[in-house]
Amino acid sequence: IRLSGSAVPFLLPLMFQLSFGYSAEESGWLLAPIALMSVVFKRFIGHILNILGYKTTLILSSLLMAGSTVSMSWLDTSSSTTWIICNLMWYGACMSMIFTSINTLTVGDLSQAQSGVGSTVLSIVQQVGIGFGIAVASIILTLYRQFMGNDGDALQHAFSYTFLTTSVFAIALVWILSYLRKTDGDHLRKKR
């Protein structure tokens, strides 16, 4: 999850500043839709999980996240702010759905006595995953920049190919999630 998920918030401000010529402040504000949509979408995730179940929700949200990451590869200096914001909101909703689902599934079977330790371990794994995802994205971007160049369109293409490459990790996640049983997490759902 973190290989693809952590790459996007790392790559976007770099792309906005280095390739699009935005200021650091503008780049920061452009990331706000990710956080906003993550919070807003949480309201609907319980309903989605109750209807679709954990396996289907996780696979669907991973495919949608891959799609949102691919769509970021289409961004360029002529992209409208509205298009950029819509892409980021789409990504924020996907990330919210994935992380809410996976976190609930991860600690859902722990007893109350184990839940504190489980949450701590989950937090540590997430932090390591964030660092790993950023490192991998950085290496991929560096390789593309060395191969394609650092100026103008070449730099933009390097970012685009990096987004495409990181979307492959989301597709790999779908393969991993396919090993979940359809009934995994059923005890956490409110069935209709």
Q: PLM features: what roles do these ranges have?
A:
Residues 149-151, 183-192:
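Short, Lys/Arg-enriched, Gly/Pro-containing loop segments at transmembrane-helix junctions
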Residues 1-146, 155-185:
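12-transmembrane solute porter fold
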